[in-house]
Amino acid sequence: MHYKARDVFAPIGLNVYKENDNLDIYIMSDKLTDANNLTLQVSLIDFKGEVIKSTQTKVTAKANVSEKVLSLSVKDYVTEEQQGNSVVKVELVDNKNNTIAHSNYFFHWPNKLNLPQTNIEQSTTYADGKYTITLKSNYLAKDVFVEIPIQGAQFNDNFFDLLPSEKKVITITSPELLKSAKTPFTIKHLRETYK
């Protein structure tokens, strides 16, 4: 839960909201000055990684305000079938292509999505006090959860969506983590819980 709260309290954030027949994208800024020269990248991606549609729009994150910057007609943007098999990936990037904020929007609750079976590839670097795990999946892995049997271990992120072919780096820190011990951890995603 606190991983989502971190995103909510970031100085600049994105919110994707479906109202009536529109998909509205908002930029929320707590900064006291405008952030200019930003690009809003919006992509419709199926769960196997095919980019169905992609658009880019120049935007400004106005100071200390929440503002709708894009509105898409759902019926013109995505078919009924695609709604159960795709995600809208929204990113706000600066002029150096650094991601300022991101958000993934699913048209249905997870139990109504056609989540694919997938395996998450991982590579791990072990150091005393810190494990660094790089994750990648060919298909969408929804609600990925990493767990390690050490009380109080700190994660830089957890319980996230791993989009097809994207890499995600997770760091786990704790004084109890030893390079030589290679303490085992588990990685699960929502589709693995289906029977």
List the predicted regions and their residue ranges.
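Carbohydrate-binding surfaces of carbohydrate-active enzymes
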Residues: 1-136, 141-156, 162-172, 177
